[in-house]
Amino acid sequence: MAQAQRQQQLKKKSFSPKMLVYENLKNNNVLRHFKQRFAQLDTLLNNPIWVKSPVIDLGLNKQHTADIKKTDSLYWAKTAHEQLAVNRHNGLEVTGQVYARPDAYFDSENDDAEQASKYKAKIQAELGWNIINSKFYQGKEKRNKVALANELSRLQGKKRQTADIYEKAADDLTEQYNFYIGTVIAHRLDNLDIMNEAYQYMLEKDRISNDKMLKVMNEKLEAEYDISILCSDRDISNKPIYRMKPSKVLVDTAALWRHIDEESIDARIVMVKEQIADNDSKLSNYLGTTRITPFARWSSYWQSNNKISNNGDVGVRFTFPIYNENPRKRKALETEKEIIRSSRNTDVKEIKQSVNILLKRIENLNQAIATEAYHINQTSKYIDMRRFAYKNQKQGYNYLMRMDEYTGLLESMERMYKLMLNRGLAIINIEKAVSIYDNNNIFKEIEL
């Protein structure tokens, strides 16, 4: 039941096309419709609703912010735990062994001195200090390795988490503009309905060619199609005329290029990758492949004569590889850094080329918007001037021509709103290309 009511409400709000073909038209009715529409348009144009251009809402929403903060805190906690593990790695290690010699139990023919030199079992414990594999050797680099790996994962995750904000911003901006564009088209459609009615009446009286009527009918069909696409689920009937304040967008290109080179997520990811390669290069050294372990050992022996003897000793245990692969590893890491830089330079070059195209488009749209704003201003003045002329025209005047004047003004407004929408979408495309989350410092909109 609730679903049926909801569908009924949507149906009431949705746009439905108007009559295309009229019958039994009368001259007085057609003229009355013209006069009513002229009066309505004069009232609407003299009392418009002034609105600012829709704002590009690109900032992260509350859910995005909460998710990113939670993920960041988890990465930072992970880094802290892993670095604490590195700091607790002091290199101390205890080893021990216990073993017996069964042959010592059966060999009883030897003299006491010889039996004293043999033993039935042995217990040995050793405390060693593995210096190289501890926090005391390159501890800073080992902690950096953990931190950089987590920072890279965090940035890559943040880039994935924020990937959809640009599509959402474009959809929101388009929806806002579509409402204003749709209301203008709806007013233009009201004009076309009356003109279509007049042309059909004139065609019935053989006072006009079929071409003019077909042209108006086609314009009417196109307008209805546009409304059905732009505002299919919104009620735009009987709306005021929304006058959007024309504006110009200024771009701080220096800040934009700086953002691409240094501040964007992609730039920070590349920076972290280079830092990882630098840090790995420091960790790749010959000493790091060796093993040097000072130790203290205590041994207890159960001799063949059933006596216990103890002894302790200290020493250094070491292992030195007879090969050294680290110079090649460092060269490989330097090559990897060059690959990262080369790939980044190529990406930046392509991004800047795309951005330059979009910047040129924004500049052209700024000029086109200024031109349309001038046309709207001049047409409005012309309509005001002609309104008094029509009132004083005692011999009558061409109603169709006057309706064309109003329709021309509406068409110019429609064009300007579409140009402003396209400019906003171009800005979003730039922000998407260079990973901008806040455009306040780079893009500035000023009223003309």
Question: Where in this protein do the model-derived segments appear?
Answer:
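Acidic, low-complexity, intrinsically disordered peripheral segments
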Residues: 2-60, 233, 245-263, 410-448
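Acidic, serine/threonine- and glycine-rich low-complexity intrinsically disordered segments
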Residues: 200-204, 208-325, 339
